[in-house]
Amino acid sequence: MSRGLGDVYKRQLNIGATLFEVFYKKKKINLILNLGNISSYKNNKNYLGATCGRYANRIRNSQFKIKGVNYKLTRNEGKNILHGGKKGFDSKIWSVKNSSKSHITYYYISPDKEEGFPGELCSSCRYSIKNSVLSINLRAKTTKTTHVNLVNHAYWNLDKIKKDVFDHYVQINANHYLENDDENIPTGKVISVDGTSFDFKKPSKIKDKFTNKLNSFDENFIINKNSKFIAKIKSSKSNISLRISSNQPGVQFYTGQHLKYSTDRKTIKKYQGMCFETQGFPNAPNNSKFPSTRLDPSQTYKHNIKFEIEEIK
C-alpha cells in the first residue's frame, strides 16, 4: 500500500506493520532495504522495516519481575529474548484502522501472556508523510502492568542501496553509550564517547571509525537531553541527508553486519543498510538505573519518530 504527498512516498505492509519503501522522488531513489517479494516477509529474519515488540532489543535471561512476580519470556537468542520473542510483532498481521493519501494507521492486539508478557496490549503504528518528512507514531495500552519498547527497524542506505554504508557521514547527538557484554546486552556501565570510535558528535564517515578491533556498530547511544535531533546521516554521493528526531532516550546504531538474504530475485549483503532504532534501553526491565520501560494500565505508551529527508545543495 502506497502513501505520500510531495517529494516522498512510502509503501508499507500489514505484516509486521512494516515500512517497505521510502522513495525520494527528486532523486528517484528508494532509501531503505526491502526483500522485494512481499511473500518473503513471512520469514523476515533481519526485521527489515518491521515494527518490533512487545519489547524490542534484548532482555537478559528472558525474564523480569513486576511487583515480586517473575515473568518468564520466550527465548529466541540463546538464553535471551530479542525483539519480542519467537513470534514478535514483526511476524503478526496488523489490521488497518484508518488511512488516507498521506497516512495509514495499523493496530494489533496482543493477548495476555503472549511470548510470556503480562497484560493484553493494544498497539498502533501510524505512518504519515508531509512534504519530505516521514513520521511514525507508536502507541500502546495495557490491561496489566508490563514492559513495552516498540521500535521501527528500517535499514537506511542513501547511496542507491547496492553499495555498503561505509561512506555515509553519521552524526549522533550523544555524549555517552552503553557498554555491551559478549551477548550484546548492556553491562550497566555508561561510557563517554570522547576519544573513542563511538564519538559521532560531529559528522564522521563510518569507515573512518573502524579499527583493527572494531569493524561494526550495534550499541545503544544515550541521547543528550533537550536535543533537537537524535542523528543525522548524509551521503556525498547522492547528496541526500536524513535527520532523525524522537522522544526516546536512546538509539541503537546498527551497521547491518549480520545482514544476509539471497533468492533468485534479490540479494542483500552485510553492511548494505544501517539502523537507527530509537528506543528505551535494552534490558531496562532488569536495571532500575535505566529509564523505565514499565507501562501501567492507567498510562499510554507514546513513541514518536520523524525522518526528515533533504537534498544537499
Which ranges hold each PLM region?
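Extended, loop-rich substrate-binding clefts of extracytoplasmic carbohydrate-active enzymes
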Residues: N70, T74-N131, G280
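A conserved active-site cap/scaffold subdomain adjacent to cofactor or substrate pockets
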Residues: L158, K162-T211
